[in-house]
Design a protein with these regions (language model features):
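Von Willebrand factor type A / integrin I
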Residues: 50-134
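Scaffold/interface architecture of coatomer-like assemblies
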Residues: 32-34, 39-50
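Short regulatory "switch" loops immediately downstream of catalytic or recognition motifs
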Residues: 7, 33-37, 82
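Solvent-exposed loop/turn segments at secondary-structure junctions
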Residues: 28-32, 83-86
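Von Willebrand factor
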Residues: 1-21, 26-31
Length: 134
Protein backbone atom coordinates (compact mmCIF):
# COMPACT_ATOMS: atom_id res chain seq x y z
CA UNK A 1 0.00 0.00 0.00
CA UNK A 2 2.63 2.49 1.08
CA UNK A 3 4.97 1.60 -1.76
CA UNK A 4 2.54 2.85 -4.40
CA UNK A 5 0.43 5.30 -2.47
CA UNK A 6 3.04 7.74 -1.25
CA UNK A 7 4.30 8.59 -4.73
CA UNK A 8 0.80 9.03 -6.16
CA UNK A 9 -0.78 11.29 -3.53
CA UNK A 10 -0.84 14.87 -4.76
CA UNK A 11 -0.20 17.61 -2.27
CA UNK A 12 -1.81 21.05 -2.28
CA UNK A 13 0.36 23.91 -3.41
CA UNK A 14 -0.02 27.65 -3.22
CA UNK A 15 -1.65 27.66 -6.66
CA UNK A 16 -3.44 24.31 -6.86
CA UNK A 17 -5.76 22.44 -4.53
CA UNK A 18 -6.14 18.70 -4.81
CA UNK A 19 -8.48 16.17 -3.32
CA UNK A 20 -7.12 12.67 -3.78
CA UNK A 21 -9.67 9.89 -4.15
CA UNK A 22 -8.91 6.24 -3.48
CA UNK A 23 -11.25 3.31 -4.12
CA UNK A 24 -10.32 0.13 -2.25
CA UNK A 25 -12.03 -3.11 -3.21
CA UNK A 26 -11.88 -5.85 -0.59
CA UNK A 27 -13.21 -9.39 -0.61
CA UNK A 28 -14.70 -8.77 2.82
CA UNK A 29 -13.01 -11.72 4.50
CA UNK A 30 -11.32 -11.30 7.87
CA UNK A 31 -8.76 -14.04 7.47
CA UNK A 32 -6.26 -14.81 4.75
CA UNK A 33 -6.86 -17.90 2.66
CA UNK A 34 -5.66 -21.12 4.32
CA UNK A 35 -4.60 -19.34 7.52
CA UNK A 36 -6.48 -21.20 10.23
CA UNK A 37 -4.75 -19.26 13.03
CA UNK A 38 -6.56 -16.07 12.00
CA UNK A 39 -9.98 -17.59 12.64
CA UNK A 40 -9.32 -18.04 16.38
CA UNK A 41 -9.94 -14.33 16.91
CA UNK A 42 -13.24 -14.23 15.05
CA UNK A 43 -15.47 -15.34 17.99
CA UNK A 44 -13.97 -12.65 20.25
CA UNK A 45 -14.50 -9.98 17.61
CA UNK A 46 -18.07 -11.14 16.93
CA UNK A 47 -18.82 -10.81 20.66
CA UNK A 48 -17.32 -7.32 20.65
CA UNK A 49 -19.89 -6.28 18.03
CA UNK A 50 -22.73 -7.22 20.37
CA UNK A 51 -21.16 -5.36 23.29
CA UNK A 52 -20.19 -2.42 21.09
CA UNK A 53 -16.47 -2.36 21.89
CA UNK A 54 -14.91 -3.65 18.66
CA UNK A 55 -12.28 -0.89 18.48
CA UNK A 56 -11.28 -1.46 22.10
CA UNK A 57 -11.04 -5.23 21.53
CA UNK A 58 -8.88 -4.77 18.43
CA UNK A 59 -6.54 -2.48 20.39
CA UNK A 60 -6.51 -4.71 23.48
CA UNK A 61 -5.53 -7.74 21.38
CA UNK A 62 -2.91 -5.71 19.48
CA UNK A 63 -4.62 -6.31 16.15
CA UNK A 64 -4.47 -2.75 14.83
CA UNK A 65 -3.18 -2.43 11.28
CA UNK A 66 0.28 -0.85 11.55
CA UNK A 67 0.23 2.82 10.61
CA UNK A 68 2.32 3.85 7.63
CA UNK A 69 3.89 7.28 7.42
CA UNK A 70 1.56 8.66 4.74
CA UNK A 71 -0.48 11.83 5.23
CA UNK A 72 -4.01 11.26 3.95
CA UNK A 73 -5.40 14.60 5.15
CA UNK A 74 -6.17 15.54 1.56
CA UNK A 75 -7.57 12.14 0.63
CA UNK A 76 -11.08 10.71 0.47
CA UNK A 77 -11.40 6.94 0.55
CA UNK A 78 -14.20 4.60 -0.53
CA UNK A 79 -13.92 0.99 0.62
CA UNK A 80 -16.13 -1.48 -1.25
CA UNK A 81 -16.92 -4.97 -0.04
CA UNK A 82 -17.45 -7.39 -2.91
CA UNK A 83 -18.14 -10.67 -1.14
CA UNK A 84 -20.42 -10.96 1.90
CA UNK A 85 -19.79 -14.01 4.06
CA UNK A 86 -22.84 -16.22 4.43
CA UNK A 87 -21.79 -17.14 7.97
CA UNK A 88 -20.96 -13.59 9.02
CA UNK A 89 -24.25 -11.93 8.00
CA UNK A 90 -22.70 -8.46 8.09
CA UNK A 91 -20.46 -9.14 11.08
CA UNK A 92 -17.27 -9.42 9.04
CA UNK A 93 -18.12 -6.15 7.29
CA UNK A 94 -18.56 -4.35 10.62
CA UNK A 95 -15.26 -5.71 11.94
CA UNK A 96 -13.42 -4.77 8.74
CA UNK A 97 -15.01 -1.33 8.97
CA UNK A 98 -13.61 -0.93 12.50
CA UNK A 99 -10.13 -2.04 11.36
CA UNK A 100 -10.00 0.20 8.31
CA UNK A 101 -11.54 3.24 10.04
CA UNK A 102 -9.02 3.07 12.89
CA UNK A 103 -6.10 2.68 10.48
CA UNK A 104 -7.14 5.42 8.06
CA UNK A 105 -8.03 7.86 10.84
CA UNK A 106 -4.54 7.43 12.30
CA UNK A 107 -3.23 8.59 8.91
CA UNK A 108 -5.63 11.58 9.00
CA UNK A 109 -7.84 10.53 6.08
CA UNK A 110 -10.09 13.43 5.13
CA UNK A 111 -13.17 11.27 4.48
CA UNK A 112 -13.78 7.54 4.84
CA UNK A 113 -16.81 5.95 3.24
CA UNK A 114 -17.86 2.29 3.15
CA UNK A 115 -20.02 0.48 0.64
CA UNK A 116 -21.56 -2.77 1.83
CA UNK A 117 -21.86 -5.43 -0.86
CA UNK A 118 -24.68 -4.71 -3.31
CA UNK A 119 -26.57 -7.43 -5.17
CA UNK A 120 -26.51 -5.50 -8.44
CA UNK A 121 -23.17 -4.56 -9.96
CA UNK A 122 -24.60 -1.42 -11.55
CA UNK A 123 -25.46 -0.03 -8.10
CA UNK A 124 -21.84 -0.48 -7.01
CA UNK A 125 -20.53 1.08 -10.24
CA UNK A 126 -22.88 4.06 -9.84
CA UNK A 127 -21.79 4.58 -6.22
CA UNK A 128 -18.12 4.50 -7.22
CA UNK A 129 -18.74 6.97 -10.07
CA UNK A 130 -20.62 9.33 -7.72
CA UNK A 131 -17.77 9.15 -5.22
CA UNK A 132 -15.22 10.04 -7.89
CA UNK A 133 -17.30 12.94 -9.25
CA UNK A 134 -18.06 14.52 -5.84
Amino acid sequence: FKRYLESRIKKNTLFENYVNKIVIITDGYLEAEDRAADTKLTPQLYKSLIIGNTNEMISMLGLNIPKVNVDLSNTEILICEVNERKTGKGKDFEILKAYWTDWLQRMNARKIQFLHREQATDITVNTINQFIRQ
